[in-house]
Protein backbone atom coordinates (compact mmCIF):
# COMPACT_ATOMS: atom_id res chain seq x y z
CA UNK A 1 0.00 0.00 0.00
CA UNK A 2 2.71 2.51 0.90
CA UNK A 3 4.40 2.17 -2.51
CA UNK A 4 1.08 2.95 -4.26
CA UNK A 5 0.66 6.06 -2.11
CA UNK A 6 4.20 7.21 -2.91
CA UNK A 7 3.70 6.57 -6.65
CA UNK A 8 0.45 8.57 -6.64
CA UNK A 9 1.72 11.49 -4.57
CA UNK A 10 5.26 11.77 -5.94
CA UNK A 11 4.35 13.73 -9.11
CA UNK A 12 2.11 16.10 -7.14
CA UNK A 13 4.78 16.71 -4.51
CA UNK A 14 7.53 17.05 -7.13
CA UNK A 15 5.53 19.70 -9.01
CA UNK A 16 5.01 21.79 -5.86
CA UNK A 17 8.63 21.45 -4.76
CA UNK A 18 10.09 22.25 -8.19
CA UNK A 19 7.76 25.25 -8.61
CA UNK A 20 9.71 26.80 -5.72
CA UNK A 21 13.02 25.66 -7.23
CA UNK A 22 13.61 23.22 -4.38
CA UNK A 23 14.70 19.61 -4.72
CA UNK A 24 12.53 16.69 -3.62
CA UNK A 25 15.19 14.56 -1.94
CA UNK A 26 12.90 11.78 -0.75
CA UNK A 27 9.26 10.91 -0.18
CA UNK A 28 8.06 8.11 2.06
CA UNK A 29 4.79 6.83 3.46
CA UNK A 30 5.47 4.72 6.54
CA UNK A 31 3.67 3.28 9.52
CA UNK A 32 5.21 3.82 12.93
CA UNK A 33 3.27 2.23 15.75
CA UNK A 34 -0.40 2.97 15.15
CA UNK A 35 0.22 6.07 13.02
CA UNK A 36 0.95 6.66 9.35
CA UNK A 37 3.38 9.37 8.19
CA UNK A 38 3.79 10.99 4.79
CA UNK A 39 7.29 12.47 4.86
CA UNK A 40 8.88 14.75 2.31
CA UNK A 41 12.51 15.75 2.49
CA UNK A 42 13.28 18.88 0.51
CA UNK A 43 16.42 20.91 -0.04
CA UNK A 44 17.99 23.73 -2.01
CA UNK A 45 21.51 25.09 -2.37
CA UNK A 46 22.41 26.72 0.93
CA UNK A 47 19.79 24.70 2.81
CA UNK A 48 16.06 24.86 3.39
CA UNK A 49 14.43 26.76 6.25
CA UNK A 50 11.35 26.10 8.37
CA UNK A 51 9.20 28.68 6.58
CA UNK A 52 9.91 27.01 3.24
CA UNK A 53 9.03 23.60 4.70
CA UNK A 54 5.77 25.02 6.08
CA UNK A 55 4.92 26.59 2.72
CA UNK A 56 5.41 23.26 0.89
CA UNK A 57 3.45 21.45 3.60
CA UNK A 58 0.50 23.86 3.29
CA UNK A 59 0.44 23.63 -0.52
CA UNK A 60 0.73 19.85 -0.58
CA UNK A 61 -1.92 19.44 2.11
CA UNK A 62 -4.32 21.57 0.07
CA UNK A 63 -3.64 19.56 -3.12
CA UNK A 64 -4.02 16.21 -1.35
CA UNK A 65 -7.30 17.28 0.25
CA UNK A 66 -8.67 18.18 -3.20
CA UNK A 67 -7.64 14.92 -4.93
CA UNK A 68 -10.38 12.47 -5.92
CA UNK A 69 -10.26 9.66 -5.08
CA UNK A 70 -8.42 10.35 -1.84
CA UNK A 71 -4.88 8.96 -2.33
CA UNK A 72 -4.57 8.34 1.43
CA UNK A 73 -7.91 7.18 2.86
CA UNK A 74 -6.61 6.61 6.40
CA UNK A 75 -5.49 9.28 8.88
CA UNK A 76 -1.84 10.32 8.56
CA UNK A 77 0.63 12.99 9.60
CA UNK A 78 2.28 15.13 6.91
CA UNK A 79 5.89 16.04 7.67
CA UNK A 80 8.06 18.23 5.45
CA UNK A 81 11.67 18.76 6.46
CA UNK A 82 15.26 19.13 5.40
CA UNK A 83 17.16 15.89 4.81
CA UNK A 84 19.64 17.11 7.42
CA UNK A 85 23.39 16.71 7.63
CA UNK A 86 23.11 12.97 7.01
CA UNK A 87 21.22 13.33 3.76
CA UNK A 88 20.32 10.04 2.04
CA UNK A 89 22.01 9.26 -1.27
CA UNK A 90 19.48 7.76 -3.66
CA UNK A 91 19.66 9.42 -7.06
CA UNK A 92 22.65 9.45 -9.38
CA UNK A 93 23.07 13.19 -8.82
CA UNK A 94 23.21 12.59 -5.04
CA UNK A 95 26.14 10.21 -5.48
CA UNK A 96 27.93 12.52 -7.92
CA UNK A 97 27.51 15.49 -5.55
CA UNK A 98 28.87 13.39 -2.66
CA UNK A 99 32.25 12.68 -4.30
CA UNK A 100 34.92 13.88 -1.90
CA UNK A 101 32.53 13.82 1.06
CA UNK A 102 32.35 11.51 4.06
CA UNK A 103 29.65 8.85 3.57
CA UNK A 104 28.04 5.93 5.39
CA UNK A 105 27.19 2.91 3.22
CA UNK A 106 25.30 -0.12 4.52
CA UNK A 107 25.35 -3.41 2.63
CA UNK A 108 22.94 -6.32 2.38
CA UNK A 109 25.80 -8.79 2.93
CA UNK A 110 29.34 -8.54 4.26
CA UNK A 111 32.13 -7.43 1.96
CA UNK A 112 35.68 -7.91 3.24
CA UNK A 113 34.13 -8.87 6.59
CA UNK A 114 32.10 -5.64 6.97
CA UNK A 115 28.48 -4.65 6.35
CA UNK A 116 29.04 -0.93 6.99
CA UNK A 117 31.66 1.33 5.46
CA UNK A 118 32.27 4.94 6.46
CA UNK A 119 34.82 6.98 4.60
CA UNK A 120 35.44 9.42 1.79
CA UNK A 121 33.58 8.72 -1.43
CA UNK A 122 36.28 8.93 -4.08
CA UNK A 123 34.63 7.60 -7.24
CA UNK A 124 31.20 6.83 -8.63
CA UNK A 125 30.29 4.84 -11.72
CA UNK A 126 26.84 3.71 -12.84
CA UNK A 127 27.48 0.36 -11.13
CA UNK A 128 29.99 1.02 -8.31
CA UNK A 129 31.09 3.33 -5.50
CA UNK A 130 34.68 3.60 -4.29
CA UNK A 131 35.32 4.59 -0.68
CA UNK A 132 38.58 5.35 1.12
CA UNK A 133 38.15 4.37 4.75
CA UNK A 134 40.17 3.88 7.89
CA UNK A 135 40.43 0.31 9.20
CA UNK A 136 41.87 0.78 12.68
CA UNK A 137 44.99 2.75 11.69
CA UNK A 138 45.28 1.74 8.03
CA UNK A 139 43.81 3.55 5.07
CA UNK A 140 42.01 1.16 2.74
CA UNK A 141 39.98 1.47 -0.42
CA UNK A 142 36.91 -0.58 -1.28
CA UNK A 143 34.85 -0.66 -4.46
CA UNK A 144 31.25 -1.65 -3.85
CA UNK A 145 28.75 -2.81 -6.45
CA UNK A 146 25.60 -0.70 -6.18
CA UNK A 147 23.28 -3.71 -6.03
CA UNK A 148 25.00 -4.66 -2.74
CA UNK A 149 24.03 -1.34 -1.11
CA UNK A 150 21.06 -1.36 1.24
CA UNK A 151 21.38 2.33 2.10
CA UNK A 152 23.79 5.20 1.61
CA UNK A 153 23.92 8.66 3.15
CA UNK A 154 26.23 11.51 3.94
CA UNK A 155 27.80 11.10 7.37
CA UNK A 156 29.20 13.41 9.99
CA UNK A 157 32.84 12.71 10.76
CA UNK A 158 33.83 12.90 14.42
UniProtKB/Swiss-Prot annotation:
SUPFAM superfamilies: YhbC-like, C-terminal domain, YhbC-like, N-terminal domain
Compartmental location: Cytoplasm
Keyword vocabulary terms for this entry: Cytoplasm, Ribosome biogenesis
GO biological process: ribosomal small subunit assembly; translation
Domain of life where this protein originates: Bacteria
Function in brief: Required for maturation of 30S ribosomal subunits.
Similarity remark: Belongs to the RimP family.
Name of the featured protein: Ribosome maturation factor RimP
Lineage: Bacteria, Bacillati, Bacillota, Bacilli, Lactobacillales
